Amino acid sequence: MIFSADFPGGYGGKDLWISEYDKREDSWLSPNNLGADINTDGDEMFPYLSENNTLYFSSNGYIGLGGLDVFKAESTGDKTWGNAENLQYPINSPEHDFGIIFERGSDKRGYITSSRVDLGGKGKDDLYNFNLPEIQFSLSVFVSNKETNEQIPGVTIKVTGIDTSTA
């Protein structure tokens, strides 16, 4: 179970903690802090662990678009996660965005709570559904000699995304 709490020994504000249930002892084990890759001196709240063990949560301790923003951290092993990544617009807004969940079997369709007003919200906490489109872009590159401005033939350009995908 991953949860948010303001326990002693944290990084400040509310941190994300993990605890496991011991079936033999019929009790929860002592919680462990998820560490500095996740927690900040602000508040980390509303954790959600997806089917592929990606951790989603909201925080006001990272640089974001405003208020609480939704972040994700990819699993790096047994109950550990990499650095938090801001999900940006359109998931995040200048207002509070939190409580993200995805539909079963999907990493594109889900629901989020937000106090945004740009989508007809009332400025209070409203529930929105979303369907993230595949990212598509076009890139034109001209590689030339700096001094002669002549095109250099046979150049290969490799574009690498933050998820290490290449094009």
Task: Report residues per predicted region.
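Short, conserved micro-motifs composed of acidic
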Residues: 1-142, 146-149, 156-159, 165
